Amino acid sequence: MNRQEKSVEISELSKIFSSSGSVVVAHYKGISVAQIKDLRKKVREAGGGVKVAKNRLVKIAVSDTSLKGVSDLFVGQSLIVYSVDPIVAPKISVSFANDNKQFVVLGGILEKDILDQDSIKRIASLPNIDGIRSMIISAIQFNSTRLVNLLNAPQTKIVRAISAFVDKNQQS
């Protein structure tokens, strides 16, 4: 890799770190090419990407940013899983790590915060944005139905009481 190629690679890495909602760093030693292709496909379908980069170039890319601490994670065979959606990269990475024991999640970045392995696993257990939206809509629909029933209940009781009174008077 010549100097110009390295410069292009560093700018690509800087762009990934600055524009992604989440970035997960993982070791992939012992993972087959087919498994990496499968990971790339899953991440791409979810709107993200997977990048294998030289550790030295990653360290240069983050050296002038607030993400300098993430460079400590880049030791050995490391790759980056990234996405604009903050939940996608952690969720897919942790799921892939559960299926492939050689794939080890080391940590990552959420927005501009550096996270450890446990934090990435906790984030992976959260629902994605579509899941959160559906939960909010369900809660609104359920509560609005309860409100309508609550508002209709007194009217129904009054109508029943008047109807019973009228029936009683007609019988007398």
Swiss-Prot record:
Organism, as annotated: Liberibacter africanus
Pfam families, per database record: Ribosomal_L10 (PF00466)
GO CC terms of this entry: large ribosomal subunit
Entry function: Forms part of the ribosomal stalk, playing a central role in the interaction of the ribosome with GTP-bound translation factors.
Quaternary context: Part of the ribosomal stalk of the 50S ribosomal subunit. The N-terminus interacts with L11 and the large rRNA to form the base of the stalk. The C-terminus forms an elongated spine to which L12 dimers bind in a sequential fashion forming a multimeric L10(L12)X complex.
InterPro entries in the record: Ribosomal_uL10, Ribosomal_uL10-like_sf, Ribosomal_uL10_bac, Ribosomal_uL10_bac_type, Ribosomal_uL10_CS_bac
Gene3D superfamilies: 3.30.70.1730
A molecular-function term among this protein's GO annotations: large ribosomal subunit rRNA binding
The UniProt record lists the keyword Ribonucleoprotein: yes
Entry keyword Transferase: no
Recorded family membership: Belongs to the universal ribosomal protein uL10 family.
Keywords: Ribonucleoprotein, Ribosomal protein, RNA-binding, rRNA-binding
Protein name per UniProt: Large ribosomal subunit protein uL10
GO terms under biological process: translation
